[in-house]
């Protein structure tokens, strides 16, 4: 499977700054504003994509799972929501193994998610789509496809249809595509930060 690959690593009190910087260079231009958010607390900060400033903000939140809004928001907006997202820059496929809720994926389970991700890339590449950014999300895989769409209902409908179509085509009993990640203020785990879900 041809792709850019980033991995999710880290421990309870650290993160991989190098992986974070790689992802920033690929996904978050320095002049764009995004929200980063810690879960489950909901602590958040909106800022421009200056790598040093973003790394500082992430470092303040790494005691929790840290996410970013995948699409740009209005300058100085306090939060990412439907009214503050400027446009849609990324189509996200979130592939996870089927497992008990709140339990970390085993290596075998992650392999099943990897196979589904590979099938998606092969399918879309055969239809002329570009190479995506592949991210190890800790318990599964994310595929980021670059798009240029407005933040409007028609774009949301198109993205929702794409997710459903690919899920119907490639879901397996062992791993599935999340069909719900079609909202414009969608957040996703920042590469290089710790995937906190269940026991290690």
Language-model features, listed with the residues they occupy:
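DNA replication initiation on ssDNA origins
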Residues: 1-90, 95-107, 111, 194
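Alpha-helical structural motif
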Residues: 16-20, 50, 54, 116, ...
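A generic structural signal for short, non-catalytic loop/turn and secondary-structure boundary residues
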Residues: 29, 60-63, 84-86, 127, ...
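Conserved short beta-strand edge segments in small beta-sheet-based binding/regulatory domains
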Residues: 67-69, 168-182
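Catalytic micro-motifs at enzyme active sites that drive phosphoryl/nucleotidyl and oxygen chemistry
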Residues: 76-83, 120-138, 174-179
């Amino acid at each position: 499977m041809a792709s850019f690959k980033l991995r999710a690593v880290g421990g309870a009190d650290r993160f991989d700054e190098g992986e974070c910087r790689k992802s920033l260079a690929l996904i978050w231009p320095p002049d764009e504003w995004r929200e980063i958010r810690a879960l489950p607390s909901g602590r958040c900060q909106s800022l421009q994509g200056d790598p040093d400033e973003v790394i500082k903000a992430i470092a303040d939140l790494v005691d929790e799972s840290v996410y970013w809004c995948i699409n740009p928001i209005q300058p100085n907006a306090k939060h990412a929501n439907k009214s503050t997202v400027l446009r849609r820059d990324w189509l996200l496929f979130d592939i996870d193994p089927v497992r008990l809720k709140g339990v970390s994926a085993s290596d075998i389970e992650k392999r099943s998610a990897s196979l589904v991700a590979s099938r998606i890339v092969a399918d879309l590449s055969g239809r002329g789509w570009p190479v995506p950014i592949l991210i190890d999300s800790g318990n599964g895989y994310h595929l980021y496809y670059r798009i240029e769409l407005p933040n409007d209902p028609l774009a949301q409908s198109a993205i929702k249809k794409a997710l459903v179509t690919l899920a119907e085509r490639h879901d397996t009993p062992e791993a599935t595509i999340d069909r719900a990640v079609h909202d414009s203020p969608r957040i996703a785990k920042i590469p290089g930060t710790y995937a906190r879900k269940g026991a290690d």
